[in-house]
């Protein structure tokens, strides 16, 4: 999703997809990604299934220092948080941004450069299992979702975010509004 496809892959995708009776996608806008590859009548929407996790309401309480988190992977071209981290550098107030992130090269190099600048305001954590993560997110004041910079892909983590029972702030570089973020910081 974060790089341009080679021209010949479209032919291979079309050939592979021709062998299926149906193609299922998790939400309607994802059908656009298959335009020209398969007839619209072959593409059906089947929402993702989930196992619900019960969260103890006692976990959900305000932190002394506004604390928020993101859990997932970053992509240089469709889910790049540099604009947000640059914004955080301008803040002259206490906060703690906890990031549970895969240890890929792009994410680690980018986050380590901001860690040097933000210090203890940025906590970088390795991925943990889904249920533990939902419990950790429940301890935050709110959670951050970086929307993809495209319309045909949507992060499945929003389901887990909702189970954490914490407010969700979603944005990308075009939709980020500092005044909305400040309102979340203030509770």
Model-identified regions with their sequence ranges:
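Carbohydrate-associated surface elements
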Residues: 29, 49
């Amino acid at each position: 999703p974060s790089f341009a496809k080679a021209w010949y892959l479209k032919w291979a995708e079309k050939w592979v997809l021709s062998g299926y009776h149906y193609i299922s996608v998790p939400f309607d806008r994802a059908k656009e990604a298959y335009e020209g590859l398969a007839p619209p009548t072959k593409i059906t929407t089947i929402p993702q299934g989930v196992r619900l996790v019960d969260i103890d309401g006692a976990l959900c309480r305000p932190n002394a220092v506004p604390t928020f988190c993101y859990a997932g992977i970053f992509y240089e071209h469709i889910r790049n948080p540099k604009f947000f981290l640059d914004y955080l550098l301008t803040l002259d107030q206490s906060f703690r941004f906890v990031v549970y992130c895969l240890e890929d090269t792009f994410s680690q190099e980018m986050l380590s450069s901001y860690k040097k600048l933000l210090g203890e305001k940025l906590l970088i954590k390795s991925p943990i299992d889904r249920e533990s993560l939902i419990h950790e997110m429940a301890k935050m004041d709110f959670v951050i979702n970086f929307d993809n910079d495209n319309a045909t892909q949507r992060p499945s983590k929003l389901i887990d975010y909702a189970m954490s029972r914490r407010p969700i702030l979603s944005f990308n570089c075009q939709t980020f509004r500092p005044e909305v973020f400040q309102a979340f910081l203030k509770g």
